[in-house]
Amino acid sequence: RQLFWITGVLAFFMSPLADNLTTALVLCAVVMAVGSASPKFISMACINIVVAANAGGAFSPFGDITTLMVWQAGKVEFFTFFALIIPSIVNYIIPAVIMSFFIGNERPTLAVENIEIKFGGKFIILLGVLTIATAVSFHNFFHLPPVLGMMTGLSYLLFFGYYIKRNENADKPYDVLENIAHIEWDTLLFFFGVIISVSGLGLIGYLELVSQFMYTDLGATNANILVGILSAIVDNIPVMFAVLSMDPSMPISQWLLATLTAGVGGSMLSIGSAAGVALMGQAKGNYTF
């Protein structure tokens, strides 16, 4: 039960910086290694991690792709997202408390291993934080798109990667570009296809009809609650992109509500968020639909 809470709390606080997908993958690997003898624990812990990562990512522009999209579109300022921290905590704590009653107090078997951080690993973490600071600074002070700040962060990594390659005594030299070549291109192409499809619907005129029904007939609050429910079924990224394409006239409070519901609504089903989809593959049948 302690491991259940530790991984959940870590997921909640790591997600705003590392994004919910990365956080879920890292902590799922921990749960799989420590709780391999208990499939029930792995299942509950993975659900807990997904809920925590999605809730934690809702109050940071870097916590989820949906929040990043809203920030880049200029609908909500960077520091305004932190107003969602209390709702995010509530969205994590209530499901976690309920799930904790189904977790036993057994102690996992511990394997003693000598684990060392690779050469330059700590400095790369620092570069990651510096990259986030660069993206925020570029956007707030110079009114440049955040992508320029993130690409500048990639240049930090390229320069430091060259330093590692020159100074590290390793059988296989460190190569940043080789690591980039192994990223999940299928996921990127999926998002690319979804965005093109939604843009096509907007060009034809269907999004205007949907916007009229949701934000005029139903009202902004009801519509944004519906956004959360749809996020669990369709995935939160295409839903948020559709909302941004509709561009309804809403106050910041309603944009924050849409951001929150899209982020945490994806936790209701395993296919509702990138973190949930990724863990279905990594958990090897222990975390399913």
Cite the ranges covered by each PLM segment:
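Transmembrane helical segments that form the transport core of multi-pass membrane transport proteins
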Residues: A135, H139-Q254
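Hydrophobic alpha-helical transmembrane segments
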Residues: F4-V9, C46-I47, F81-I86, K122-L130, ...
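Long, contiguous bundles of hydrophobic transmembrane helices that form the permeation core
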Residues: Y92-D171
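Short juxtamembrane and helix-loop transition motifs at transmembrane-helix boundaries
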Residues: T7-A11, E106-I117, L218-N222
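Lipid-exposed faces of alpha-helical membrane segments in multi-pass integral membrane proteins
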Residues: I6, L10, A52, V90, ...
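Juxtamembrane membrane-interface segments at transmembrane alpha-helix termini
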Residues: G35-K40, S60-P61, F159-N169
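Transmembrane-helix bundle segments that line or gate the permeation/cavity pathway
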Residues: S43, I49, G56, S60-P61, ...
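Membrane-interfacial helix-loop connectors
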Residues: M14-A18, L25-G56, I65, M69-I85, ...
